[in-house]
Structure formats: C-alpha cells, structure tokens
From Swiss-Prot:
<dbReference type="GO" id="GO:0003723">
    <property type="term" value="F:RNA binding"/>
</dbReference>
<dbReference type="Pfam" id="PF00467">
    <property type="entry name" value="KOW"/>
</dbReference>
<protein>
    <recommendedName>
        <fullName>Large ribosomal subunit protein eL14</fullName>
    </recommendedName>
</protein>
<keyword id="KW-0687">Ribonucleoprotein</keyword>
<dbReference type="GO" id="GO:0022625">
    <property type="term" value="C:cytosolic large ribosomal subunit"/>
</dbReference>
<dbReference type="InterPro" id="IPR008991">
    <property type="entry name" value="Translation_prot_SH3-like_sf"/>
</dbReference>
<dbReference type="InterPro" id="IPR023651">
    <property type="entry name" value="Ribosomal_eL14_arc"/>
</dbReference>
<comment type="similarity">
    <text>Belongs to the eukaryotic ribosomal protein eL14 family.</text>
</comment>
<dbReference type="GO" id="GO:0006412">
    <property type="term" value="P:translation"/>
</dbReference>
<dbReference type="InterPro" id="IPR005824">
    <property type="entry name" value="KOW"/>
</dbReference>
<dbReference type="InterPro" id="IPR014722">
    <property type="entry name" value="Rib_uL2_dom2"/>
</dbReference>
<dbReference type="GO" id="GO:0003735">
    <property type="term" value="F:structural constituent of ribosome"/>
</dbReference>
<keyword id="KW-0689">Ribosomal protein</keyword>
<dbReference type="GO" id="GO:0042273">
    <property type="term" value="P:ribosomal large subunit biogenesis"/>
</dbReference>
<dbReference type="InterPro" id="IPR039660">
    <property type="entry name" value="Ribosomal_eL14"/>
</dbReference>
Length: 77
C-alpha cells in the first residue's frame, strides 16, 4: 500500500465521486485527509480512497488551482 502523504494521487472508491482522481492536500489524523482535484475539496475518510503509486509535488494546504496545475503537468487530469 502506498504511503498516505501530501501529494499522493488517489482514486475515490465510495460516494457520488467514486472513480474520480484526487490528491491528498492535507493529512488531518489517522482516519481523515483533505482531498482535491477532479472532486470537490473536502475532508474524506481514508476508507473511501485508494492510494496509487503516483505522487505530485505539492505543499501542505495547496490551493485548488495549484492542485489542478500539478495534476495537469503530471498528465493525470
């Protein structure tokens, strides 16, 4: 399993946004992270995301524009 860290690209597995690509923007605690990308920026339970081996270069609490630019540069959006 890939590490849960800022910049880790994930796939949403549950909810209305299931199947969409997202990036971890902030780690809140052992159960929750803040995600952004092709999904609305929100807090998400780690049980609802599947981390991938891909990672983009982001700082903690990066803006939505920075996240979208990083995903575009990596060819993931």
């Amino acid at each position: 399993m890939a590490a849960i860290e800022v910049g880790r690209v994930c796939i949403k597995t549950l909810g209305r946004e299931a199947g969409n690509t997202c990036v971890i923007v902030e780690v809140l605690d052992k159960n929750f992270v803040v995600i952004d990308g092709s999904v609305k920026r929100r807090r998400c339970n780690l049980k609802h995301v599947e981390p991938t081996d891909k990672k983009v270069d982001l700082e903690k609490a990066a803006s939505t524009e920075e996240v979208k630019l990083a995903l575009d540069a990596a060819g993931l959006l």
